[in-house]
């Protein structure tokens, strides 16, 4: 999850409308200057909480991994305060830990989008060789899905956002 989180933070910087909040009743749309990353944490099938890693964009990979682990443990142990579960600007849901293929999580309001990481599995893919012939090979494939509020940004931004994450993970 730390690698995906770091790639997501990079994409949120590139596409700031995805790192925003929207309150239709108040008529407020805020684009946030920092990434407060929400991490959906399963409470042993007894519920789910979104822990917030404040200013996640200030951490390197090792620091982010440590904060994700600490936040998850805090929530599972029930030793969290309101500040630990509020203020996220974007959420990641790690549904792949439950062996999912494609899910559509519900947006954690007032965020405007949520990323779902699915399980990585071996899948058949078509590979084109240098001479132009196709063959089938087995590769590890992971799926990312994004649910977003179309009132804030359109599908083209969502796809560019996902492609940015994909490029960061592949390179």
Question: Model-flagged regions — what are they?
Answer:
Residues 1-171:
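C-terminal catalytic/motor cores of large multi-domain enzyme assemblies
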């Amino acid at each position: 999850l730390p690698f995906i989180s770091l790639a997501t933070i990079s994409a949120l910087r590139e596409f700031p409308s995805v790192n925003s909040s929207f309150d239709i009743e108040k008529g407020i749309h805020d684009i946030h200057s920092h990434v407060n990353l929400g991490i959906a944490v399963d409470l042993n099938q007894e519920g789910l909480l979104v822990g917030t890693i404040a200013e996640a964009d200030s951490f390197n990979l090792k620091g982010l991994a440590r904060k994700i682990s600490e936040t998850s443990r805090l929530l599972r142990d029930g030793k969290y305060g309101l500040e630990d579960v509020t203020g996220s600007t974007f959420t990641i849901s790690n549904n792949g830990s439950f062996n999912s293929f494609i899910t559509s999580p519900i947006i954690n309001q007032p965020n405007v989008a949520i990323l779902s990481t699915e399980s990585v599995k071996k899948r058949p893919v078509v590979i084109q060789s240098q001479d132009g012939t196709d063959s089938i090979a087995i590769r590890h494939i992971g799926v990312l899905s994004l649910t977003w509020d179309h009132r804030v940004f359109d599908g083209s931004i969502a796809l560019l956002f996902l492609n940015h994450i994909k490029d960061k993970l592949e390179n």
